Amino acid sequence: MAEQNLGPRDFFAKEDAIADLGLIACPGAEELCKLVDSHLVRWAREVGNTDVDSFIIPSDCPRFQSGDAKGLVKASTRGDDLYIFVDPGNYSVTYQLLGYENHLSPDDHFQNLMRLIQAVAGRAHRISVIMPSLYGGRQHRRVSRESLDCAFALQQLRDVGVKNIITFDAHDPRVMNAVPTMSFDNVMPTYQ
């Protein structure tokens, strides 16, 4: 089988585009999102699409004094092919609650992801989630009466309209069996 070399033109040709591309970063995943955006903008310019400065759609997850939060998407995503970045393992993100500095837990990151998906309100053409470390991925099989958080989270994402999950080095990639009709890409770092 011949090796196929794809270039920027294969991804940014207007005649082949199904939907406009949009990137959304959950709190804590902004750096990764900006890195991906810089590559995409460079590739788009290489094929003559000079009117694109960024594919990032501004968003935020502000917190109230009660600790509750809300998801805000600050531009239209109608008809876009969205890629939402979330890093559940990033403990450096903090917020103030009752005068104390709190760090976001993996549960907080997952809820921020769900909030931003809700803020899109089903208007995107397709939603893909890029999650470098799979939420709940270390607990992949039931030993006694315990929850299967990763499988349940994947099912929740499917139920709110996510079509693709992209993760890196999942602890047990068989967790994709929880959502057999959804695309699940487990990129292994050893391929690089």
Task: Please provide the spans of the model-predicted regions.
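PRPP-associated nucleotide enzymes
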Residues: 1-192
